[in-house]
Amino acid sequence: MFTFALLLLCVQGCLIQNVYGQCCGCGCGGGCGCGCYGGEGDGNVNVCGELPVCGETLVCGRVPICGGVCFKGPACASGCVSICGRCCGCGCGGCGGCGCGCGGCGCGCGGCGGCGCGRRCCCC
């Protein structure tokens, strides 16, 4: 039992070093080259609950999301944002055909950006 507890403690220490290494630029080694300096994920990432993000988040590639995505407040995006599924809570799929006026970007332009709001939303 003691061996298992010691192993679990070591694993937790490695996880803490990885987290602090990505935030601070160095791990517990204090800049001596012993820390983790970021990384790239490969595989599945599951998030249950809230995922607060402050600042800028750059995502290159695809992020598949199975389930619902809810935004509270502004969700600003530069570049192209494609949302497949339902863009708004009315169930129309973001096409604006239900009369709710969501049109994909919230201003009723249909997501084409022709209204001058500067936001584009491609809903498929």
Swiss-Prot record:
Location of the region described as Right arm (Gly- and Cys-rich tandem repeats) in the Swiss-Prot/TrEMBL record: 84-124
Region of interest: Left arm? 22-35
Secretion signal span: 1-21
Q: Positions of the region Central domain? A: 36-83
Going by the UniProt record, its keywords in alphabetical order are: Repeat, Signal
Q: Which domain of life is it from?
A: Eukaryota
**What is the purpose of this protein?**
This protein is one of many from the eggshell of the silk moth.
Q: Which family does it belong to?
A: Belongs to the chorion protein family.
Query: Under what name is this protein listed?
Result: Chorion class high-cysteine HCA protein 12
> Which species is this record about?
Bombyx mori (Silk moth)
